[in-house]
A protein has these predicted regions:
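Glycine-rich segments within core transmembrane alpha-helices of 12-TM secondary carriers
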Residues: 76-79, 157-178, 365-376
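Helix-loop junctions at membrane interfaces in 12-TM secondary transporters
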Residues: 115-127, 316-330
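Juxtamembrane intracellular "pre-TM" segments in multi-pass secondary transporters
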Residues: 8-23, 209-240, 431
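Intracellular juxtamembrane helix-capping segments at the cytosolic ends
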Residues: 137-151, 339-353
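A membrane-interface helix-boundary motif in multi-pass transporters
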Residues: 95-98, 180-196, 381-402
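Helix-loop boundary and gating motifs at the non-cytosolic
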Residues: 12-76, 238-243, 247-264, 272
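Helix-to-loop junctions at the C-terminal end of transmembrane segments
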Residues: 78-94, 182, 286-299, 383
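Structural signature of the two symmetry-related core transmembrane helices
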Residues: 97-112, 301-316
Length: 431
């Protein structure tokens, strides 16, 4: 689509004239968007019901169960390129509103289609991949709208805080809700996810205001090309990406743990959901603690101690033999693992090249997602095909994570030697 075309963009002029009202409207769209594209994911609210269906109805082993979610998330691994496409190719005259309305509607309809999909592995997987494709596009468009609005209103801090709060709330809601849905007919899960996704449609129609703006699609692609070249030569970013990959590439045992909870501890799905609730609450406490610590400690110190704590918490799964221990271990792991994730995401933000923040950060998150779901599949395969014990898998996971810790000291001093507050003062004091 060469040449200049008329497209819709965030109504920058009207936002600047009525900043409070515009920011409130934008916040409503972002809240609905983050809620819908987070909670209604097959890897979030529908994960426990789907895992339960695959294990107990289709009698899938751990490898097949983990593989299902790896391939189900295929679209999310390609999210950075969706951002380039939605920026360059307007849909019905705009880049945000139409993409959100179309993808949210199609995602909701796809969830409803899943209700009548035969309970066969490949057919279920195909529909879930379609669902995630539409949800990923909606998430990309909502994210682009948030950035656009934040730039126009100088409200990046407030909008980011809203986004983070909604995501954490989704994690807390997910545990008991997913546990309950897994205990009843799967159709209710699909209907609930479809309903949550469709909430985004009326909110977008009512509150997302756009006006026409001239955009040269060739310029967008040229800019994307420049960003890709810049990212490809960003040694600091790739060093950080290497550390993240090593941390996440440890053989995963999320699916193996699900089977252990049901087969050995004989937990119901509602009890499994309660354990997720404990982990989610402890994760929120970790986020609060990290927010305080990052202004007092430099990133190198945070990375080392957070990754060590995550490793220690991981070893707790060696003692996962009763409900009481499970509660304590899930809480400890929710706290420790969240701290490590926050430190690594902090590293990702700092190491992304200036001018390529969105694409660079998305690429690093995609690397994280690909490694996370891929290693869960790998870990499950080790148990099923090579008869590795669960405890051996836990030790292998912890050892691989521990290897990543010394590499923190090889990261460029520029990005790890400062505290969060020092970075802010340095940025604001630039001439």
């Amino acid at each position: 689509m060469a040449g200049s075309v008329m497209v819709d963009s965030a109504a920058v002029s009207s936002i600047q004239q009525r900043p409070r009202k515009a920011l409130a409207y934008a916040a409503l769209v972002i809240v609905a968007g983050v809620l819908a594209t987070t909670l209604a994911q097959s890897q979030v609210l529908a994960r426990l019901p789907l895992q339960n269906l695959l294990k107990n109805e289709l009698h899938a082993d751990r490898t097949a169960n983990a593989a299902f979610f790896f391939w189900a998330g295929l679209a999310w691994y390609l999210k950075p390129f969706a951002g380039i496409l939605t920026d360059a190719f307007p849909l019905f005259g705009n880049r945000r509103k139409s993409y959100i309305l179309m993808s949210a509607t199609l995602a909701a309809l796809s969830w409803l289609a899943l209700i009548v999909t035969p309970h066969e592995y490949r057919k279920l997987l195909f529909v879930v991949i379609v669902i995630n494709t539409f949800m990923m596009i909606a998430s990309t468009a909502v994210g682009g709208y948030m950035v656009e609005t934040a730039q126009a209103t100088s409200g990046s801090g407030r909008l980011t805080a809203i986004r983070q709060f909604i995501q954490q709330a989704c994690l807390v809601i997910n545990g008991p809700a997913a546990g309950y849905f897994a205990s009843i007919a799967f159709g209710w899960t699909a209907a609930a996810c479809g309903g949550i996704m469709f909430l985004l449609v009326p909110v977008t129609i009512l509150f997302l205001q756009e006006q026409r703006k001239r955009l040269d699609s060739r310029e967008v692609f040229d800019n994307a090309k420049r960003q890709l070249v810049k990212i490809g030569t960003a040694r600091t970013m790739w060093a950080a990406a290497g550390l993240m990959a090593l941390f996440y590439i440890a053989p995963g045992f999320a699916t193996a743990l699900f089977y252990k909870q049901q087969n050995e501890l004989h937990l119901s799905t509602q009890t499994q959901g309660f354990l997720q609730l404990i982990a989610g609450i402890c994760g929120i406490l970790a986020a609060v603690g990290y927010g305080i610590s990052c202004r007092r400690l430099n990133l190198r110190t945070l990375l080392v101690w957070c990754m060590l704590l995550a490793t220690a918490a991981n070893l707790g799964y060696l003692f996962y033999s009763s409900m009481g221990r499970a509660q304590a271990i899930e809480g400890l792991n929710g706290f420790g693992y969240t701290l490590a994730e926050l430190a690594l995401m902090d590293l990702a933000v700092r190491s992304t090249p200036a001018g390529s923040e969105g694409l660079g950060f998305s690429l690093m998150v995609s690397i994280r997602n690909l490694a996370l779901f891929g290693t869960d599949w790998f870990g499950s395969n080790l148990l099923d095909q090579y008869h590795l014990s669960f405890d051996s898998l836990v030790v292998a996971n912890s050892a691989t994570t521990l290897i990543a810790v010394p590499l923190v000291f090889l990261l460029p001093r520029l990005i790890v030697s400062r505290k969060d507050a020092e970075i802010y003062r340095t940025t604001t004091n630039r001439p």
